[in-house]
Regions:
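Cell-envelope and extracellular/periplasmic
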Residues: 9-15, 37-45, 59, 66, ...
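Histidine-centered active-site loop/cap adjacent to the catalytic His
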Residues: 20, 112, 130-168
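Structural recognition of the beta-strand scaffold that forms the well-ordered cores
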Residues: 6-11, 35-39, 71-76, 113-115, ...
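Surface-exposed cleft-lining segments at the edges of enzyme active sites
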Residues: 10-12, 42-52, 89-95
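Substrate-gating cap/lid alpha-helix
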Residues: 82-118
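Serine-esterase "nucleophile elbow" of acetyl-processing enzymes
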Residues: 1-13, 18-32, 163
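Glycine-rich anion/phosphate-binding loops
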Residues: 15-21, 49-57
Length: 168
């Protein structure tokens, strides 16, 4: 376990942001969480889904959270390693993936969020290979980085007033 508080990981490998929206009611609501850590969009953006579509999905998840008294906490989207994705899955990565991720992360940074990405990219903005053998799903070293970022920010998240989640 990488976090200093109890969590349930609802991630599904291969999920798009649209799929995350579709399974919200079934997967999230039974747990009645106070907070929801949200890291979605990598698979969508890798495939070239427009940033605006992923942002719309993030907004929908935020609305669903707030309507059920759940505080959404967005996590910034890590970089990708297209060569490793190609080798692991024989799948291409959209040529403009970096600008797509940058656009979605710019939106995320306007919300209650935790930046989990510092130190993940090499000098070219590519996900460091030791963090994810397949180029997209973080292995234990990458998960430890995410855990440390969340743990370091969590006290500040808990201290936020309710109004922090109402602003768009």
């Amino acid at each position: 376990n990488y976090l200093m508080f109890p969590t349930v990981n609802l991630a599904q490998s291969g999920d798009t942001s649209e799929m995350a929206v579709e399974r919200f009611d079934k997967d999230v609501l039974p747990f009645q969480p106070s907070y929801l850590l949200i890291l979605i969009g990598s698979n969508s953006l890798r495939a070239g889904v427009p940033a605006e579509d992923v942002i719309a999905d993030l907004k929908t998840i935020k609305e669903k959270c707030l309507s059920h008294h759940i505080r959404p906490v967005f996590l910034t989207i890590p970089p990708l390693n297209p060569a490793h994705i190609k080798r692991a899955f024989d799948e291409p990565t959209a040529e403009n993936w970096q600008s797509l991720i940058a656009a979605v992360n710019a939106y995320i940074r306007t919300q209650v969020h935790i930046d989990i990405t510092p130190g993940m990219a090499d000098s070219h903005g590519i996900l460091r290979p030791e963090l994810a053998v397949d180029g997209i799903h973080l292995d234990p070293p990458g998960k430890k980085m995410i855990g440390a970022a969340i743990n370091n920010a969590w006290k500040g998240i808990l201290a936020l007033p309710d109004t922090a989640w109402q602003e768009d």
